[in-house]
Amino acid sequence: MAEGIDRKMDDRMEFTTSADVTVAPTFQDMHLKENLLRGIYAYGYESPSAVQSRAIVQICKGRDTIAQAQSGTGKTATFSISMLQVIDTAVRETQALVLSPTRELATQIQSVVMALGDYMNVQCHACIGGTNVGEDIRKLDYGQHIVSGTPGRVADMIRRRNLRTRHIKMLVLDEADELLNRGFREQIYDVYRYLPPATQVVVVSATLPYDVLDMTTKFMTDPVRILVKRDELTLEGLKQYFIAVEKEEWKFDTLCDLYDTLTITQAVIFCNTRRKVDWLTDKMREANFTVSSMHGEMPQKERDSIMQDFRQGNSRVLISTDVWARGIDVQQVSLVINYDLPVNRENYIHRIGRSGRFGRKGVAINFVTSEDVRILRDIELYYSTQIDEMPMNVADLLT
């Protein structure tokens, strides 16, 4: 179900956009299929967000597109609506492919596509690592209009010839900065080599560093650009604070002191390593605090079950690595704690964008040791923002 997109954020966005991009003020103005419009309204959208009103028409025209907008502004629906518009459901072949950096994000995209395409009889499969290969093969052999997946498993299914590529007309790279970072770069190229030469490429992300934009020239043709200025990228409406903890060992006591505040709604605590997540989870539980945890090396079934519990509000505090930072939408999260500041400053916006989704109040708290001060200053400079020391009444900011 779509919640209201933050229109205040829309109004403050400055789009550095290709000159020929027009704005479609309503979904009707986009000339979408009738059954797709029904799905959009049933999902809870009334009018398009800033990025949707600019990007959907361009993507539906078949243009290669680079779309950048902040977390919580409807980016997933932007490309989901576009894919649903261009596929032909009478042809039971894969026609659109979305690649995401995490399994959770790939699964979430599948559920958004299925919800928006509810009246279209669309088939969409999440093709992700850590799941049964036989099930993937069965689903793909049955025929899927859209596949949302992680690069490794998708490349594997293409090589096995279970994912047939000859009808693919659109490739979407979601959270493209993370995908194109070293880890996935080769796998992306691997997938791209198997696609028809005329495949349209859509690149979507909250952050697009210059080297990523530069790299897209290798597989995009005259792309239309829909961009927010980088210095506009700090997340409006989110309050950001730091707590000076001086030494690493003092962080744990500080977190325990904050626990009552954390459980006002729901909170996510980020650590930089899997080992740290496990250590902190054990330590919190030993001190009789209720927490759940998730990282990339857990079996997929366990990750799914933890995510479901957290989405339903059964668990209120989740400790995680950056696997959770990208695009996972849980409406009730109002507080993010960076137990460790992110190693990659571009992940900062993805982490704190988990709180205050769609214009709700959100607070981000950064634990800063004396060694972290330089990293914090670097983040402030990069996002042209100011992060103040946390006030005593932080609980009041969440209610």
Curated annotation (Swiss-Prot):
PROSITE patterns: DEAD_ATP_HELICASE, HELICASE_ATP_BIND_1, HELICASE_CTER, Q_MOTIF. It holds the Pfam family Helicase_C. One of its GO terms (cellular component) is catalytic step 2 spliceosome. The Q motif is unique to and characteristic of the DEAD box family of RNA helicases and controls ATP binding and hydrolysis. Its EC number is 3.6.4.13. GO terms for biological process: mRNA splicing, via spliceosome; rRNA processing. Its main location: nucleus. Residues 237-398 form the Helicase C-terminal domain. It is an enzyme of class 3 (hydrolase). A motif (DEAD box) lies at residues 174-177. This is ATP-dependent RNA helicase fal1. Belongs to the DEAD box helicase family. DDX48/FAL1 subfamily. Signal peptide: none annotated. The gene is fal1. It is found in: Nucleus, Nucleolus. GO terms for molecular function: ATP binding; ATP hydrolysis activity; mRNA binding; RNA helicase activity. PANTHER family: ATP-DEPENDENT RNA HELICASE DBP3. ATP binds at residues 69-76. Keywords: ATP-binding, Helicase, Hydrolase, Nucleotide-binding, Nucleus, Ribosome biogenesis, RNA-binding, rRNA processing. It catalyses: ATP + H2O = ADP + phosphate + H(+). InterPro entries: DEAD/DEAH_box_helicase_dom (IPR011545), Helicase_ATP-bd (IPR014001), Helicase_C-like (IPR001650), P-loop_NTPase (IPR027417), RNA-helicase_DEAD-box_CS (IPR000629), RNA_helicase_DEAD_Q_motif (IPR014014). A motif (Q motif) lies at residues 25-53.
